[in-house]
Amino acid sequence: MVPSAGQFALFALGILLAVCQALENSTSALSADPPIAAAVVSHFNDCPDSHSQFCFHGTCRFLVQEDKPACVCHSGYVGARCEHADLLAVVAASQKKQAITALVVVSIVALAVLIITCVLIHCCQVRKHCEWCRALICRHEKPSALLKGRTACCHSETVV
């Protein structure tokens, strides 16, 4: 049984979606266990207003046991006060986005070429008498077929 063009296109689209999902979730945890509840007493409190500008690129948290502020940095920043840009994180995120974009574009182009090819093959198999198909086939026909006494594919004439 030969799969149809539609089945093949759906299969290719399924593979594309699976690859994109795998790339997107490449750093996620493998277990689906629910998160464990935190202790009732937290080690962090909100920073007082006097430390509202303590973190440059992050969120301020006040460490209860040490009685001092600490920062939770935004993505792409590091340091005690989130003052340094993490260039490796920025470059890695940019490259990942470019790779996903390139993969999607190449897959869409390949899928379009595949669908067009399948439609053309189907057209020429079902409608062999179609002028357009005949012109396409006859353009590649070699005259040697006529010299050997065979029937030409485009003409019903036989050369003796």
From Swiss-Prot:
One of its GO terms (cellular component) is plasma membrane. InterPro entries: EGF-like_dom. A lipid is attached at C153, C154 (S-palmitoyl cysteine). One of its GO terms (molecular function) is growth factor activity. GO terms for biological process: cell surface receptor signaling pathway; epidermal growth factor receptor signaling pathway; positive regulation of cell division; positive regulation of cell population proliferation; positive regulation of epithelial cell proliferation; positive regulation of MAPK cascade; positive regulation of mitotic nuclear division. Residues 1-23 form the signal peptide. Glycans are attached at N25. Residues 43-83 form the EGF-like domain. Interacts with the PDZ domains of MAGI3, SDCBP and SNTA1. The interaction with SDCBP, is required for the targeting to the cell surface. In the endoplasmic reticulum, in its immature form (i.e. with a prosegment and lacking full N-glycosylation), interacts with CNIH. In the Golgi apparatus, may form a complex with CNIH and GORASP2. Interacts (via cytoplasmic C-terminal domain) with NKD2. Disulfide bonds join C47-C60, C55-C71, C73-C82. Residues 24-98 are extracellular. This is Protransforming growth factor alpha. The chain crosses the membrane at residues 99-124. Residues 125-160 are cytoplasmic. TGF alpha is a mitogenic polypeptide that is able to bind to the EGF receptor/EGFR and to act synergistically with TGF beta to promote anchorage-independent cell proliferation in soft agar. Keywords: Cell membrane, Disulfide bond, EGF-like domain, Glycoprotein, Growth factor, Lipoprotein, Membrane, Mitogen, Palmitate, Secreted, Signal, Transmembrane, Transmembrane helix. It comes from the Eukaryota. Residues 24-39, 90-160 form a propeptide.
